[in-house]
Amino acid sequence: MDGSTRFTLLLVLFACRLFPQNPETPERGFTFYERFEGSVNQLGVFTKLDTTVGYNLNTHVSFAAGLPVYFVRPSGEVTRLVGTQSANGIGNVYGQVRLMAATAAINVASTLTVTAPTGDKAKGFSTGHATVDWSNYFDLSFGRITPFGEVGFANSVSDTFFFQRPYTTQGFVAHVQGGGRFQLARTVAIGASGYAVEPSGQQTVISRVARATAGSSNANSNSRGRGNHGVFETVNNTVVPSDLARDHGVSAWLKVSPAAAVDFYGGYTRSTKFALDTVFFGIGVNVGKIVRNRGV
């Protein structure tokens, strides 16, 4: 583990999520969320429309299922180097079970997410296999300041609110993040966090910017891409040692909630491992809450 990774892990472990896993006490009944989010960096524009429906059994247990739709627009440089064109398509359909607990000061949540391989592997929208992610989140409130932390284990790296990744992976990973947010006003919050993805064992890296060709899938490729950049920039599907799939970085953001059921957010993420500078943005709409508030 290099020095940058150790620093990020320390930041995560000792930091006193803009988007907590349980941002408020859930209302019992059916839920319906729409979220559109994206990332812009040196490799292109990566956006996703995510539709989720579910049911809150009570304040402690909820179930949900959803389907993301991806839109990938490679940068001019990527198109020139590897000939990639724009691509759209569905991702993996997923199901979730979430356990929650809350007091006046602390929120905790444990979420199990399982996906089925419905996305196109050649476009990088799926690993071609079912995936499982178990994430555990907490936050503590001290007035306007809310530190948070999360640790999880999975067999594939996932996108986050801060980073729509230009790739996905197959193989065991541990992921951690931590930081804090500050409530500037009733509808405005800012925050910062650090994250780390720590793989174990060989990893299959599947690119969303390098398309599959007759010779691009190499089960034993050791290509390291260009310099500090990731193999996913030039190779569509390759098996690499864990070090080449490791990632760590930092994020900062602003969130505005003009209404109880609508969130706008945007910010910056720096992947120090892959030298990627990403501007991210998104809008989330709690359609279920809007419908209930209108008495439908």
Q: Where in the sequence are the language-model features?
A:
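Short glycine/proline- and aromatic-enriched beta-strand/turn motifs that initiate or cap beta-hairpins
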Residues: 20-57, 63, 70, 97
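Outer-membrane beta-barrel translocator domains and adjoining extracellular loop/strand segments
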Residues: 44-50, 74-81, 110, 120-128, ...
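Residues that define the transmembrane beta-barrel architecture of outer-membrane proteins
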Residues: 45-49, 87-93, 126-132, 157, ...
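Outer-membrane beta-barrel strand-turn architecture
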Residues: 53-61, 89, 101-106, 140-144, ...
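Outer membrane beta-barrel transmembrane domains
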Residues: 74-78, 170, 175, 179-296
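Gram-negative (and chloroplast) outer-membrane scaffold detector with strong preference
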Residues: 87-120, 130-147, 182-190
